[in-house]
């Protein structure tokens, strides 16, 4: 196996590099075991580490599968030993030799390949490497900006290799499961018309149609519905989507979702499919979950958790206003017409005075809600109320209870219409209590331990279906009702009368639109929304009515959605579906803290690709061709 050399004139030491030639890799580095002893092998990869012991030189050779120790002995071949002495971290090499059992005293039980080593007969240097800004083997992480700039180095790290492999395994399991259930994988266009769905669109100018723009899809929503109109019955796609929005830890401008749609479903039909592919996905990542997820009405979630994506590992809160007498509430300056919420955090233990004082700064009031953090003081003054509260909440020794209630000064706010299930004043109490519940649980996580993995899937992965969301939500800035999910979600059949009454009152905060429920559902895991879906509108008359309820004239609706409204007139079957965030699912399974840890080439919080230095200005010639001028 002779090597063909060429000289790098820029290398002061005239480093000789080798062509691969006809050399073929025989094994992945991390796959060799004691049973392979005596075999000839050709290994290739990066130099992870080199250790010089005089006439013996040890190289840890790394590839995707793991690390293999290569031994170069000067007594066997002085020239190969001298060549190996020039190796540095991250050089790419080929090692040709024989697999040998290690001596008993050199076996490394911490390595899968720790019983064997490759005794090298030849080393080929396939490429050199500059000194990297950090090494893949570094245990202390460098700052994220440097990691993103040199992403190709960062992705060599074991943790990132694990994350991306997990992503592949999860996506494959989902694809295989949905295919087995009769779903067709069908691609939808990336270049389509702009129909904003809440966030801003990324626009693509058309050169051949000057002054016009495509938009990158925020979701394939209308296309997948049109596929149902087209007769494909069951569709799925693991698809890239784009939203021009402000970023945070769980957002990226381009992201991947598991998108599916099916005809003639009940909500339960969609849920069964989702639970099936989630079970397959978690299994592919070495985790087990229990299916038949519990279900909770949106109103129930708000009343018990103060949020529409509750973390079921944390106890719900309890309305304890009936534990107080009217005089008690008056003395405590608590509004008797609003909920009095007891937030229970388990197994916190005795708090110091300072720790109790620290609770108030954690509280974020929504619309007049107040926190009463000293339950001990309330207990000493109102022992009967405290005993009743403890019993109603299921309080145990070491539990912390904090009360959240409305201030008496805010007034009863009873002038809400009867169709409202939760008034804004009540919602302010629930939302404030919900935020405090999460903050306290996170602050004392080391004490109660409810976030630690137990090995019991029923405790570690608390899935939930949240159902019957409001169809509309009030936008205080715009002073009108907006679609809570998107305008293609079907209202409940029982609420069509409320829709009819409110269709012309888009600017009235007391409209009956507030009580219209959507056939919408979210799947939640441990307080994180994994996905959102709904049964869709399949009748053109109802779809037009929804557009009208959102303040669109017939002309505006036709301009934005005319092609879709026309498609609905050609025998559209009932249909529904869902979309789940693949990035977020992988983030949970990999135990990562950010989506950037599970996406190969992510953007920063400023939507910048540091590796490619994108976005960038473009040539004036390109702008002229597109008919675009940039205002400075």
Mark where each language-model region is.
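Class II aminoacyl-tRNA synthetase catalytic cores and aaRS-like
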Residues: 2-632
